Amino acid sequence: MVLDVLGLLSACSYALDCVEAELVHVSDKHAKRVAYMSVCMAEQLGISDESLQDLAACALLHDNALTQYIQEELHKDVANVPQASQVGIHCTLGEKNIQRLPFHTDVKNVILYHHENANGSGPFGKTWEEIPLFSRIIHLSDLLDRAYGAKGFTEDIFNKACGYLHKNEGTVVDKECVDAFLQAFSLPHFLTLGEDRFEKNLWEKIPRIKQELRFAQIEELASFFAQIVDYKSPFTSTHSIGVAEDAKRLSRYMGFDEETVEKMYLAGALHDIGKVAVGNEILEKPGRLTEDEFAVMKHHAAYTYYILSDIDDFDEIRDWAAFHHERLDGTGYPFGKTAAELNTQERMMACIDIYQALTESRPYKQGMSHEKACEILWDMANKGWLDETIVKQVEDCFRG
């Protein structure tokens, strides 16, 4: 299957930014700005082509394991967000995660060491000579955006950023990267970091070349995305990958070709990516949602649609993913699609999402039996919400 992988990773970076904004208060578009600054610096150092693409990918995903770390190690006690040597744990997790992704070049240790300081005072005690260049570039870009991104990109901030780099050269950041940043960013260029056009500039520098992926690679990519979505809340900690696996199984059971199976697997993994834009106070509310809270929750499917819309030639998979709460009678959300507007895969995803949600165990409930879940699906089909033919296929496919 041919995919715009960098576009997918960009969408993933938006999801990460949403989660980080809630948990550790990074500024909007943090990952993309880190990627843009990194690419501009790398150009000054003679890096180009596939290496530049891989640097952009690493920069977009530099904090891919932060939410995983908070969930697993800190049990979501955000007051204890990692400092100093503790930062190394999320770097280790992030390094392991990106090994699943299809890079063009060797990016070993780039994520692992992206919080190392030039003088060896970082979490792993590595000096700048021992750290991959990509790690050092991302480290500088990340530091600047975390320190100044939320304050806006003005002449005053530019002067403060330059002052910070000069003051910390040789201790926190290395001279090679400081020089590259100062060569890449004059004041007018720095000011564009606060404008929407910097994203356009990023993709002009890094053409999004499509890659041919084997199904095993697609499964790894999908698992990576699903993990980011599912670590948003322990209430749905395995839901996305469960939907992906069910989508694969049902698609094969119904006789679809392997490309359709691959697309359905990816759509299943991504179907709830929009939930990253919904606060955990709603996702994890133990009681019934208020009308206003449910209205916010319903937006997650629309967020999925819009997040995935930025990926080239992804409309089909986007729709299969985003329409999982639509109903045949037009009473679903977010777009109120009717039967005439919903194709077979979109109808399948609606059934699969409900079936998986009913049968999986969560902290507040035990999963239902196959028989009980199918009773509910048939009730929804009889109301005109779900496709009866597909409900029957679900019943037969997942029995036993």
Role assignments for model-derived ranges:
Residues L3-G400:
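Histidine- and acidic-residue-rich, metal-dependent catalytic cores
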